[in-house]
Amino acid sequence: MNLILFGAPGAGKGTQSELLIKRQGMTQISTGDLFRAAIKGQTDLGKKAQEFMDKGQLVPDSIVIGMVEEVLQKGVQNFILDGFPRTVAQAQALDELLVKMNLSIGKAIFLEVPMRILMDRLTGRRVCKNCGAVYHIVSKPSKVEGKCDLCGGEVIQRNDDKAEVIETRLKTYEEFTSPLKEFYKKSGKYTEVDGNRDTEEVYKEIEKIIK
């Protein structure tokens, strides 16, 4: 089954995607990872995406759709779309792309988390500059402060995880992404999961939904 996993920044999409990859053999298509790889490689799309991400703004559809299409053209199956689509316009463009490629989405799962919890999660998040491993200063700190447990790389706070940018990101999310709920409710593929719980509890509920 192909899934869309969506919710506000910090809702736990990446964490749940990792579990689905390890336990269900699924493939994650994370637009955030695609952006960061493009930025690190200093590609044309990466440079354009960085300008928007650093301000906490949504990356334009033309850039996002292009990156997703490139991945799907490699023949990926049983995938999770993490962080995409973020708007109804993107969802419509995705539907057109999937029809063209003879693919479909089985479920669109929304992770619901209160705004104050999202702020706490995001401002405390730290990421390895080298391998992308994710930590949290309270719930999942690295063993040595500022150093990645996995590769020894520098652990930093991303620009888009700073308080002033987060506030913009969450407001942008509410404005553009919330209508996605209605879009997928109409398609009959929408399911909501309480993301403000233990990681395992959230995973078990998602597992039931996809079986």
Swiss-Prot record:
Residues annotated as binding AMP: 31, 36, 57-59, 83-86, 90, 158, 169
Region (LID): 124-161
Alphabetized InterPro entries for the sequence: Adenyl_kin_sub (IPR006259), Adenylat/UMP-CMP_kin (IPR000850), Adenylat_kinase_CS (IPR033690), Adenylate_kinase_lid-dom (IPR007862), P-loop_NTPase (IPR027417)
Localization of this protein: Cytoplasm
Binding site for ATP: 10-15, 125, 134-135, 197
Top-tier EC class: transferase
Major subcellular site: cytoplasm
Region (NMP): 30-59
GO cellular component terms listed in the entry, alphabetical order: cytoplasm
One MF annotation (Gene Ontology) recorded for this entry: adenylate kinase activity
Chaperone listed as a keyword: no
One GO-annotated biological process of the protein: AMP salvage
Keywords: ATP-binding, Cytoplasm, Kinase, Metal-binding, Nucleotide biosynthesis, Nucleotide-binding, Transferase, Zinc
Enzyme Commission identifier(s): 2.7.4.3
Pathway(s) served: Purine metabolism; AMP biosynthesis via salvage pathway; AMP from ADP: step 1/1
This protein's record includes keyword Kinase: yes
Domain notes: Consists of three domains, a large central CORE domain and two small peripheral domains, NMPbind and LID, which undergo movements during catalysis. The LID domain closes over the site of phosphoryl transfer upon ATP binding. Assembling and dissambling the active center during each catalytic cycle provides an effective means to prevent ATP hydrolysis. Some bacteria have evolved a zinc-coordinating structure that stabilizes the LID domain.
Family statement: Belongs to the adenylate kinase family.
Function: Catalyzes the reversible transfer of the terminal phosphate group between ATP and AMP. Plays an important role in cellular energy homeostasis and in adenine nucleotide metabolism.
Subunit text: Monomer.
Protein name, as recorded: Adenylate kinase
Phylogenetic placement of the source organism: Bacteria, Pseudomonadati, Bdellovibrionota, Bdellovibrionia, Bdellovibrionales
